[in-house]
C-alpha cells in the first residue's frame, strides 16, 4: 500500500499544500512547531478518519477557517483509490472515488504510528498497553472501535447506577439490565483481543529474537481481571464474566465501580522470563516496543498481503544507532515510511537511493533532495 498524493486545505497550519511522497522513505525535517507532525497527522486522519492527538475534529481545522479538506490518492492492491475528507463544525464526510461512504470503509487502509509516547509503552500504565492492543484489534477487526465505544458507554452508565443504588436513589434490580449488556459487550472485546494476540505474539517473539541476535526471548500474556482458561469461546467468556461479577456485587456497590471487565485488563511483557516493566533496561524496553511495532507491520501483511503505511513521528533518533539500522533494514523498499525529525543525523547514507528529503517551514512543504 502506498500514499501516492496528499492535498490539504486548512489542515492545522497548512492552508494549501500538496505532497507527492516517495514510495519508500520520506524524511520530513525542519525546526520545531513548523508542521512536521501536522503532516503525519493528516496522513493518519485520511486513512483512519480521526486524529492521533486531537480529541475533537474541530482541532485539526486552521484557526482562520471553518472547514478542512483532505484529498488522498492511495495505491492499494494495484488499484488507485481517491479518498476525500470534508470536515466542518459538527460534521465530517468521507468520499471514496467520488462516492460518499461510511467510515467503516477505512478498514481497507492500514497505517502504523510510532511516536515518542510509545517508547513508554512497557513501563507506562496498563491503560497505555490496552490502548496499543485496542488500536491493533481495531485495524484488523471491522467494527471493533464502535464495539469498544459502546462498552465504555455502558460502563460509565453502570458506574453511575452503582452510585445511585448506594445512595438509595435507584433499585438494585435496575442493574440487571446494564449487567447483561456489560457482559455481552465485554465478552466480545476480550474475545477479539485474545484472537488478535494469538496472531500478533508469535510474530513479535520472532521479531524480538532477531533484533537481539538470538539472545532474548519475548513472552507476552493477556492479563484479564477474569479467571479465563485458554481457548474459551465468546459465550464461555460471557458466562465467566457474569458469574464472577455477581460474586463481587456488594464490593462494587460499596466502591461505586465496575471492578471486572476489559477496562481493567493488561498485557504482560517479559524478556527471558523476567518482567520487562520492572527489571528491563531502557534499551531492552525500547527493543520490546520496537518488536511490537514491527510485528504490527508483519501481521497486516500476513492478513492482507500488503504492508501498511508507517509513520515515525520524531522517534527514530530516540533509538540508538543499532536499533535505527534494524528498523531501516526492516522497512527499506518494503514499507512506505514517513519520518519526522529536526535533524537527519546522517541517516541519508543508510537509505541512499531509496527516499526523499523534505523541508517544512511555517506550513510550507518543499522537496530538498533525493538520496
UniProtKB/Swiss-Prot annotation:
Indicate where this protein resides in the cell: Cytoplasm
UniProt KW keywords? ATP-binding, Cytoplasm, DNA damage, DNA repair, DNA replication, DNA-binding, Nucleotide-binding, SOS response
What are the GO BP annotations of this UniProt entry? Answer: DNA replication; DNA synthesis involved in DNA repair; double-strand break repair; SOS response
- Name any one GO molecular function: single-stranded DNA binding
Major subcellular site:
cytoplasm
A single Gene Ontology CC annotation of this entry is: cytoplasm
Looking up InterPro entries in the UniProt record yields:
DNA-binding_RecF, DNA-binding_RecF_CS, P-loop_NTPase, RecF/RecN/SMC_N, RecF_2
- Here the disulfide bonds are none
User: Which amino acid positions bind ATP, per UniProt?
Assistant: 30-37
Q: What highest taxon heads this organism's lineage?
A: Bacteria
Q: Does the keyword Acyltransferase apply?
A: no
SUPFAM superfamilies reported in the protein's UniProt record: P-loop containing nucleoside triphosphate hydrolases
Q: Which residues cross the membrane?
A: none
Function, please? The RecF protein is involved in DNA metabolism; it is required for DNA replication and normal SOS inducibility. RecF binds preferentially to single-stranded, linear DNA. It also seems to bind ATP.
Q: Which family does it belong to?
A: Belongs to the RecF family.
Name used for this protein in its record:
DNA replication and repair protein RecF
Q: What is the lineage of its organism?
A: Bacteria, Bacillati, Bacillota, Clostridia, Eubacteriales
What is the primary gene name for this protein?
Answer: recF
